[in-house]
Design a protein with these regions (language model features):
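Active-site-adjacent structural elements that line small-molecule/cofactor binding pockets in enzymes
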Residues: 1-300
């Protein structure tokens, strides 16, 4: 076991929802800080809020984190209620709501939303959810944020109140300036899927926006790296699943090539992100072998 100087979480594989309880219980028994789960609509993955609710009930200390939940695909009021419910039921210190906009047109078509306006919609959603989490009704929302609620204006408030005042901890993912600024406008921190060589600049930009907006303290900085650890069949499984997941981007081969598959590579990445000031590093697993949890535990 190595002291890597930062908290380390596990990103859960999406290929077999029934196996996630095993992963969660092993991670809880180990040194890991957080369970993370990605989001897609038109894909064979579990719905993250439902799955993480089950995992939270099967564990007692480990955080549960969406990374990232595609908020623009969802009804805003219902999402606010779901997140507040899970935050309340886990004591206000275990849910981390990682949010992003997504880039798949088929996800947006299935949800009946517009890919082209997804960033603006997320900002509008945050304006509403923050109000709802503070116990305010719909009154006045829509007067300046571009949202239209028709007959819903004046309805509410919508409970339950979250255990954490103002709502669960919110992280934003993304790479563009608008996404990084969103951290300072609405969030508590940043979730980066970039390698350390790139993430340092993103972290600095987020810190700059944080100061520009007059926010107290420092933004929480979370990094994500894709890993697989085990015999050749485990590595082959992870590579195949990663390639299928990223095929739509045209960069599947590049993503697979960046998969970290040795203890030395993973330790180096953990140290690099700790040196950049990351508060946590998520080790994201695509392969289904749950023994990876124990192998990774030996590194952290």
């Amino acid at each position: 076991m190595t002291n890597v100087g930062t908290n380390v979480g596990i990103g859960l594989p999406i290929g077999d929802p029934a196996a996630l309880l095993t992963w969660a219980r092993r991670a809880e028994a180990g040194p890991f800080s957080t369970l993370g789960l990605l989001d897609r609509l038109v894909y064979d993955n579990p719905e993250p809020l439902v799955a993480l609710s089950v995992l939270a009930g099967a564990t007692s200390r480990i955080r549960v984190q969406t990374e990232v939940l595609l908020a623009p695909l969802r009804d805003t009021a219902l999402l606010a209620k779901q997140a507040a419910t899970l935050d309340r039921m886990t004591g206000g210190n275990r849910l981390v709501l990682g949010l992003g906009v997504g880039g798949r047109d088929d996800d947006h078509r299935a949800a009946g939303t517009d890919l082209r306006t997804r960033g603006r919609r997320l900002d509008q959603q945050m304006a509403l959810m923050c109000r709802l989490w503070w116990g305010e009704p719909y009154d006045g929302v829509g007067d300046g944020d571009g949202l239209s609620y028709d007959g819903r204006v004046g309805v509410g408030p919508i409970g339950p109140a979250p255990a954490r005042p103002g709502g669960p901890q919110v992280l934003f993912g993304g790479f563009k300036p608008a996404a990084l600024e969103r951290v300072a406008r609405w969030g508590d921190g940043f979730l980066s899927a970039a390698p350390a060589s790139w993430a340092g600049g993103l972290f600095d930009t987020v810190r700059g926006f944080w100061k520009e907006y007059g926010r107290d303290g420092e933004p929480r900085l979370v990094a994500q790296v894709n890993v697989a650890l085990g015999p050749p069949d485990v590595l082959d499984d992870a590579r195949a699943r990663m390639h299928a997941y990223y095929a739509f981007t045209g960069m599947a081969n590049r993503m697979v090539a960046g998969l970290l598959t040795s203890p030395a590579e993973i330790r180096t990445a953990l140290t690099a992100f700790a040196d950049l000031g990351a508060d946590e590093v998520m080790l994201y697993c695509y392969g289904l072998d749950p023994d990876q949890v124990d192998r990774l535990a030996e590194l952290v």
